[in-house]
Amino acid sequence: MLKRTYIRTLTEDLALSLQSLGFVLELRRTQVGIFKAENAIKIKSSDEITKNFIEKKSIKIEAILDDILVLDATDDQAQRIKYGQKCVFDYEEDVSFLWVRYNGTLLAIGSLNKSCFNSLRVFNLL
C-alpha cells in the first residue's frame, strides 16, 4: 500500500463507484516502516527480559534511522550538542529531521536550518 492510503476511505470510494455500500470488516496494520508484525516479540513474563534477551531481540537504532539523513559530528560539535547549544555543520540544505552521530553512535536528533543544527532530543548513549 502507498503511504497515507486510508483503507476505510478507499473501501467507501470503491463501494460508491459500484453504486453499492461497503465497509471494512477487519483492518490490521502489519508493517510500519521497518517494523513488521511477524518480528514482534512475545514476552510471557518479566523474567524473560534479560540483558542478553534485549541485545539479541532489539533492532539497532541505526537500522531504524537508516532512511533519515545523518551527519557526523566533530569533537567540538558533539560537545556543543551535549550542552544543548546550537552548532554549525558544513551542510547547505535545510532539513526538518535528521540525526547526528558521534564516533559511530547516535548523539541527537533534530533539524538543520541555514547549516545550524537545532537538537530536538539529545541522547546519552556514549
Curated annotation (Swiss-Prot):
Lineage, highest ranks first: Bacteria, Pseudomonadati, Pseudomonadota, Alphaproteobacteria, Rickettsiales
Gene3D superfamilies membership: Pseudouridine synthase (3.30.2350.10)
Gene Ontology biological process terms from the UniProt entry: pseudouridine synthesis; RNA processing
Recorded coiled-coil stretches: none
UniProt-recorded Gene Ontology molecular function terms: catalytic activity, acting on RNA; pseudouridine synthase activity; RNA binding
Protein name in UniProt: Uncharacterized protein RP502
Organism: Rickettsia prowazekii (strain Madrid E)
Protein origin, superkingdom: Bacteria
